[in-house]
């Protein structure tokens, strides 16, 4: 079997907003990598045995006392090192160079003139000006290297940054003041490929097929002939976990699908058809709608609703698990960003991830071992594996759906009547987005039930019914978002269909709030 972890890159995180993007680019090249806090020990690096090391950017300044530094062993490990932005600056300082606060900060696009040959820039240039090769890059820095360490040479300059790139070819140390990991740097992926593949010598074994083979083998080794239980929601993560486990252990996997009455139109039937009929999984559907809605009765506070939904899920899942006396393992859809955010740095700067609604409160007495086949993978990698396992693209690329489901898209108290109206309205909205080609152009689109009534006219009579708000946004990272400028004709068609086809809705409005100041979801 292919050893997909033999060649690997260690990325030391100094706190840049782009650090996870570096890791995703390295994985995209086809090489395994891990992202660790900058304050790792020499022993940890030795045990990981990286083929190469990348130092990330940072919001910190190398000119400040007590700013983070790379472990000294990084430069004595005998492997190539690439410093990006702050990573280049700390490399320069730690090896005897000098950095200073720049008089001219660079934020945004810049053109780097390439000087002196370097393996990092081999066969790279965006344009030639008077026979001088240039790279179009993305800068984001306030400090700059003003004196090179011994044996380094300048390999790139800009008008305001004389040392925009540097290298020591003999030790295979490289620094770039710009960010090759962002798409704004046009040849960024090629630059990282030069480092990871050509300089570090990594083989590109990190592929969907190899990852599946490795995951299945590791599951078999971990659980043997034991039985495993999984809460299958129909979302991408739990679906991919289910198919990996099914491939590894077959009928020893017990999937529990909790139908909480807060799902999209026909979603419960679709999950059963997909995983029970098509893939032949051992799956139990629990109709818990009345239980969830009963607990939610009279509750309007969004956070209280989330907690109730999470608690009831745990109770229902626990009831089902008690029926399975031989289960020894609990499978979860933990992915790599969860692992990164949960990791505690000894500096205390690491973030603690929010608890997931469906795994955060499992009873201690269940005492099951954890199986987490996706814990090394980013979300985009999970999607690629899902496609390779046979999940339909329409499901893999579906817009995000909140864990509490319609519980946070029905504003205020959640009632069955409201959920039923919202399900039908939302299905019409999504159908028309798909028909018009706008579903793929938006990052997330959904309907919201507003618990207010509005006067309308239907035929010769007046009616006094509920209001639906449509929401569609465009975003790259979901940290910020713009409202989608859907065509008026499309919005008009959706509105007419909802009002005419969903009895109980009298008015449809469109949410034109960005994030910030608004959040994407209403609750």
UniProtKB/Swiss-Prot annotation:
Its EC number is 6.3.5.2. The active site is at 85 (nucleophile), 179, 181. One of its GO terms (molecular function) is ATP binding. Residues 8-205 form the Glutamine amidotransferase type-1 domain. It comes from the Bacteria. ATP binds at residues 233-239. Pathway: Purine metabolism; GMP biosynthesis; GMP from XMP (L-Gln route): step 1/1. Keywords: ATP-binding, Glutamine amidotransferase, GMP biosynthesis, Ligase, Nucleotide-binding, Purine biosynthesis. Coiled coil: none annotated. It is an enzyme of class 6 (ligase). GO terms for biological process: GMP biosynthetic process. GO terms for cellular component: cytosol. The keyword Nucleotide-binding applies. NCBIfam families: guaA_Cterm (TIGR00884), guaA_Nterm (TIGR00888), PRK00074.1 (NF000848). Homodimer. This is GMP synthase [glutamine-hydrolyzing]. It comes from Haemophilus influenzae (strain ATCC 51907 / DSM 11121 / KW20 / Rd).
């Amino acid at each position: 079997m292919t050893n997909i972890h033999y060649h690997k890159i260690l990325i030391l995180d100094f706190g840049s907003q782009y650090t996870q993007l570096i890791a995703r680019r390295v994985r995209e090249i086809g090489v395994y990598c891990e992202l660790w806090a900058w304050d790792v020990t020499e022993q940890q690096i030795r045990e990981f045995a990286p083929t190469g090391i990348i130092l990330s950017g940072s919001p910190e300044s190398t000119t400040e006392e007590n700013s983070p530094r790379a472990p000294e062993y990084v430069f004595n490990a005998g492997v190539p090192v690439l410093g990006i932005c702050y990573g280049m600056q700390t490399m320069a300082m730690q090896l005897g160079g000098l950095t200073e606060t720049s008089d001219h900060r660079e934020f945004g696009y810049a053109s780097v003139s390439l000087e002196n040959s370097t393996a990092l820039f081999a066969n790279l240039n965006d344009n030639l000006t008077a026979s001088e090769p240039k790279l179009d890059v993305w800068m984001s820095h306030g400090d700059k290297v003003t004196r090179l360490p011994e044996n380094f040479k300048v390999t790139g300059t800009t008008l305001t940054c004389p040392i925009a790139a540097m290298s020591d070819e003999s030790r295979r140390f490289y620094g770039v003041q710009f960010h090759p990991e962002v798409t704004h740097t046009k040849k960024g992926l090629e630059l990282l490929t030069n480092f990871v593949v050509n300089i570090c010598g990594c083989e590109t074994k990190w592929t969907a097929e190899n990852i599946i083979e490795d995951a299945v083998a590791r599951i078999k080794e971990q659980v043997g002939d034991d039985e495993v239980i999984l809460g299958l929601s129909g979302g991408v993560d739990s679906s991919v976990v289910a198919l990996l486990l099914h491939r590894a252990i077959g009928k020893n996997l017990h999937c529990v699908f909790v139908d909480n009455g807060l799902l999209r139109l026909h979603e419960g039937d679709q999950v059963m058809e997909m995983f029970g009929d098509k893939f032949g999984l051992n799956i139990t559907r629990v109709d818990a709608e009345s239980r969830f809605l009963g607990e939610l009765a009279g509750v309007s506070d969004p956070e209280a609703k989330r907690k109730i939904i999470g608690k009831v899920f745990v109770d229902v899942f626990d009831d089902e698990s008690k029926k399975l006396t031989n289960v020894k393992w609990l499978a979860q859809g933990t992915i790599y960003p969860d692992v990164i955010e949960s990791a505690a740095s000894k500096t205390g700067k690491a973030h603690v991830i929010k608890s997931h609604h469906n795994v955060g409160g499992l009873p201690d007495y269940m005492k099951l071992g954890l199986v987490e086949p996706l814990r090394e993978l980013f979300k985009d990698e999970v999607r690629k594996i899902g496609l390779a396992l046979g999940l339909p693209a329409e499901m893999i690329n579906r817009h995000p759906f909140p864990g509490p489901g319609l519980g946070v898209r029905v504003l205020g108290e959640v009632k069955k009547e409201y959920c039923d109206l919202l399900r039908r309205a939302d299905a019409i909205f999504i159908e028309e987005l798909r028909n018009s080609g706008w579903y793929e152009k938006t990052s997330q689109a959904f309907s919201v039930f507003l618990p207010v009534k509005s006067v309308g006219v239907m035929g010769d009579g007046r009616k006094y019914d509920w209001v639906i708000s449509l929401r569609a946004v465009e975003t790259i990272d979901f940290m910020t978002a713009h409202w989608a400028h859907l065509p008026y004709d499309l919005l008009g068609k959706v509105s007419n269909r909802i009002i005419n086809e969903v009895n109980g809705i009298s008015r449809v409005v469109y949410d034109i709030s960005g994030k910030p100041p608004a959040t994407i979801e209403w609750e």
